[in-house]
Amino acid sequence: MIELKNVSKVFTTKKGNVEALKSTSLQVKKGEVFGIIGYSGAGKSTLIRCVNLLEKPTTGNIIVNEQDLTTLSTKELAKARQKIGMIFQGFNLLKTVTVYENIALPLRLAGVPKLEIEKRVEKYLRIVDLFNRKDAYPSELSGGQKQRVAIARALSHEPEVLLSDEATSALDPETTDSILDLLLKINEEIGITILLITHEMNVIQRICDRVAVMEHGAVVESGTVKDIFTNPQHVTTKKFVNSAFAAKIPAEVQKELQRTGEIVTLSFIGNSSGEPALAVATKRFQVYPNILSGNITQLKHEAYGKLVIHMQGEQNEINHALSFLQEQGIIVEGGRTDYGKQVLFG
């Protein structure tokens, strides 16, 4: 559906050339929600703007719907862009016209027949649950409602791809969740492919199927959201994963606790998150776990949790208990054994 092949982007400034993208390649499958996450300056905004050629790449190929956009004429590119919708952090609504007209006007400019315009505007305003505000002006809407209008406008052209450029970063947490739920609903009901960029791990974990992590203009790690959460490799990825869990154990506390036992991080995914495996382990083996911190969250359609424990007991008993937990589908990290390299909350 979307493929970037060795895409680079160099901006020329008074101080010299700035390489915003460095030979970046990635693939987005048809019908999935693909997230790109990175800190400010990572290159994610440049990347997503290259997908519809709002930014023309310096080198590389952009393939969308089996068309290499970098080879198209101006007329051909304009036609191809009709199948690529985009929403932004700023809503870009026309302040002097109604919600209805904000959606209808671009369709008129595109030459869509009047009856078809009426049909589409009603259809997509109902999808975003704003049909009852069709005669309102943008100044009368909340931030979340404005973004819903922007989403309806993008969908009214009936694209196959929807690009989201930090669409929720200006919204409060509750409104962000409602917009994410709406995007997930659109993906599941309409089947549209969504490519989004964000600096918030909450966005990735709530609606994405796969994710790419960017740093300094390059993709440093990518995979399914489940794999990224349960087995992050790059240091930047680990920071993002840890940001989803508020707990942090001070180094001094860790050092003191490690004198009397092992600090272990247990990760639960899917069905294992609801099983009393730790309780069973304490009955089966002579180990005494003390819970230091814990959290459970949702990765799109399955639960994911982390539990940091201080486990006391004879080393042999601890080893057997941790092996038992792994057999129950729990990911075990930390401690003095080879169950993991480090405690993620350290």
From Swiss-Prot:
Location in the cell = Cell membrane
| Positions bound to ATP | 38-45
Keyword Nuclease found? no
What PROSITE patterns does the entry give? ABC_TRANSPORTER_1 (PS00211), ABC_TRANSPORTER_2 (PS50893), METN (PS51264)
Q: Which reaction does it catalyse?
A: L-methionine(out) + ATP + H2O = L-methionine(in) + ADP + phosphate + H(+); D-methionine(out) + ATP + H2O = D-methionine(in) + ADP + phosphate + H(+)
Q: How does it assemble?
A: The complex is composed of two ATP-binding proteins (MetN), two transmembrane proteins (MetI) and a solute-binding protein (MetQ).
Physiological role: Part of the ABC transporter complex MetNIQ involved in methionine import. Responsible for energy coupling to the transport system.
Alphabetic keyword roster: Amino-acid transport, ATP-binding, Cell membrane, Membrane, Nucleotide-binding, Translocase, Transport
Question: What gene, per UniProt, encodes this protein?
Answer: metN1
Looking up SUPFAM superfamilies in the UniProt record yields: ACT-like, P-loop containing nucleoside triphosphate hydrolases
Can you provide one Gene Ontology molecular function annotated for this UniProt record?
ATP binding
* Enzyme's top EC category: translocase
Q: Where are the transmembrane segments?
A: none
Q: Which family does it belong to?
A: Belongs to the ABC transporter superfamily. Methionine importer (TC 3.A.1.24) family.
Q: Which residues form a coiled coil?
A: none
The protein here is known as: Methionine import ATP-binding protein MetN 1
Q: Which residues form the ABC transporter domain?
A: 2-241
